[in-house]
Design a protein with these regions (language model features):
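ATP-binding N-terminal substructure of ATP-dependent carboxylate-amine bond-forming enzymes
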Residues: 1-109, 131
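Phosphate-binding core of ATP-grasp and ATP-grasp-like enzymes
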Residues: 173-227, 232-265, 269-277, 289-302, ...
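An anion-binding loop in the catalytic cleft
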Residues: 341-354
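Short glycine-/aliphatic-rich beta-strand segments at the starts of folded cytosolic domains
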Residues: 305-314
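Active-site nucleotide/adenylate-binding loops and adjacent lid/helix of ATP-dependent enzymes
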Residues: 103-192, 196-242, 355
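A conserved FAD-binding loop/helix module that cradles the flavin
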Residues: 280-281
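A structural micro-motif
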Residues: 32, 50, 92-93, 119-122, ...
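Extracellular/lumenal mucin-like low-complexity stalks
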Residues: 313, 318-321
Length: 355
């Protein structure tokens, strides 16, 4: 039986980006210390944590030392190498579980898992050779989207294929890796549900948010999402079923396409999620606190939405809007303290209460 952590315990977090930063702040509010493990120097989370180890994920000595100095380990991104998890697991528990992580790390396993639960995904074909790509294209037709099975995020590692696409060139451009071809979903809009499950099996889901992506990167999330009552209930029940079937502990983000009024699951992330940032200003207990509560073995908090919110990301040079947003005064600003401005880099976000 997994232990219940008391305030004052230390939570280890793999990854020091903005999600690790906001997890650290939520943990600190509950009296926990955090220790960040991250390869790069001066990551956002290290400014708000009590411990920071700068090391690569294959530095097993540092990983062992890190894991033996904390009471539980969680993570802010899903592409953690298996070898690192093997080391950590010998020292302390990891939440969410390795099983959830393994499935979400591989788009093929993920789709098979979702279909097995009886839920819809885009149609798909495994692709592991140029001939395989030609065969998959004959099956699924165009438009379709070719994605790397692993290590993709924010639209990276994927390409949209049309009638004139050249399979040889495309296969080579994606690095001849293990791929998946997905039928193009002609959706009207995209939504996501942020759900959480505690160690004793309590489940709580935040209201679905409606997401707008540009170039594969999330731009805005609006709550409430444009859904019928039935669709909203279905999205929440699907999320709960995924949590239940994985015996999951922590927060999950499940992304859906809404196409012809049908909910089609795109993917899930076994962690706090960018499309859940609205909860920071729209709920008594936000996704970050909910995650810390769950992995600490505490009861989940009240995630009921008390207002309508729009969350907007500040991407790349949109961070230059900061002075205007400060002058505006009516939005809640969340800045990550990143120094280098790069195209596509998430620099901050803000939440605006609509009503
Ligand atoms: P992903 O990295 O798989 O979440 O994809 C990023 C974004 O690309 C999604 O949020 C969608 O806007 C779009 N997208 C991904 N897969 C598909 C698909 N099969 N059909 C249509 N659009 C897609």
């Amino acid at each position: 039986m997994s232990k219940v952590l008391s305030s004052g315990s230390t939570i280890g977090i793999l990854g020091g980006g903005q999600l690790g930063q906001m997890l650290s702040m939520a943990a600190a509010r509950l009296g926990f210390k955090t220790h960040i493990f991250e390869p790069s120097a001066n990551p956002p989370a290290s400014n708000v944590s009590s411990g920071f180890t700068q090391a690569e994920y294959d530095d097993y000595d540092k990983l062992k030392k890190f894991a033996s100095s904390v009471d539980v380990v969680t993570y802010e991104f899903e592409n953690i190498p298996t070898g690192a998890l093997d080391i950590i697991e010998k020292e302390c528990e990891i939440f969410p579980s390795r099983e959830a992580l393994k499935i979400s790390q591989d788009r093929l396993l993920e789709k098979k898992f979702i279909n097995k639960l009886g839920f819809k995904t885009a149609s798909f074909c495994e692709v592991s050779s140029q001939e395989g790509l030609i065969f998959a294209l004959e099956n699924l037709g165009t438009p379709s989207i070719l994605k790397t099975r692993r290590f993709g995020y924010d639209g990276k590692g994927q390409v949209k294929l049309g009638a004139t696409s050249n399979p040889k060139e495309i296969w080579e451009s994606l690095g001849e890796k293990e791929l998946i071809l997905e039928g193009f979903v002609d959706f009207s809009h995209e939504i996501s549900v942020i759900g959480s499950r505690s160690k004793d099996g309590q489940i709580s889901c935040f209201d679905p948010g409606e997401n707008v992506h540009k170039d594969g990167i999330l731009r805005t999330t609006t709550v409430p999402a444009n859904l019928t009552t039935q669709q909203k209930t279905d999205a929440v029940l699907i999320t709960a079923k995924i949590l239940e079937s994985l015996n999951y502990i922590g927060v999950i983000g499940v992304e859906f396409f809404v196409a012809n009024s049908t909910l089609i699951i795109n993917e899930f992330a076994p962690r706090v999620h960018n499309s859940g940032h609205w909860t920071q200003n729209g709920c008594t207990v936000d996704q970050f606190e909910q995650h810390i509560r769950a992995i600490a073995g505490w009861n989940l908090g009240n995630g009921e939405r008390h207002c309508d919110v729009i969350m907007e990301n500040l991407i790349g040079d949109q961070i230059n809007k900061t002075n205007d947003l400060i002058a505006d005064g009516s939005v809640s600003l969340h800045l990550y303290g990143k120094v280098d401005i790069k195209p596509g880099r998430k620099m901050g976000h803000f939440n605006r209460i609509i009503k």
